[in-house]
């Protein structure tokens, strides 16, 4: 049984090596395969989109519960509402800290 497990791992390793070799033969360098660092603005935008999506999902689930949709429990609605509330509060705190940092930097003399 252990031998079959090892042969499965070896076959997976061979497949992974083949994929890497194919990528390198197509002119793709390992540096291009590595994820690129995200900019602060892009990360902030993705975070705001996640907060918005959480709020929309919680609102939709609340409406579904109000309409009596099957499979939607009050527990799930309350948990989603709390998740969206925490996400929004976190976003507000990040905004407040960014504003405070901007004010501090703008008050510095050059």
From Swiss-Prot:
Positions of transmembrane segments: none
Pfam families in UniProt: FliE
Keywords from the named record: Bacterial flagellum
Molecular functions (GO terms): cytoskeletal motor activity; structural molecule activity
Ligase found in the keyword field: no
Compartment(s): Bacterial flagellum basal body
One example of a Gene Ontology biological process annotation: bacterial-type flagellum-dependent cell motility
Any one GO CC term of the record: bacterial-type flagellum basal body
Assigned protein family: Belongs to the FliE family.
Protein name in UniProt: Flagellar hook-basal body complex protein FliE
Organism, scientific name: Bordetella petrii (strain ATCC BAA-461 / DSM 12804 / CCUG 43448)
């Amino acid at each position: 049984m252990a031998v079959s497990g090892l042969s499965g791992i070896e076959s997976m390793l061979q497949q992974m090596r083949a994929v890497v070799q194919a990528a390198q033969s197509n002119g793709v360098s390992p540096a291009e395969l590595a994820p690129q660092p995200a900019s602060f603005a892009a990360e902030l935008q993705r975070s705001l989109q996640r907060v918005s999506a959480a709020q929309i999902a919680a609102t939709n689930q609340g409406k579904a519960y109000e309409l009596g949709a099957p499979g939607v429990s009050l527990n799930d609605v309350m948990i989603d509402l709390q998740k969206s509330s925490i996400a929004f509060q976190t976003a507000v705190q990040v905004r407040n800290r960014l504003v405070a940092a901007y004010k501090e930097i703008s008050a510095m003399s050059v």
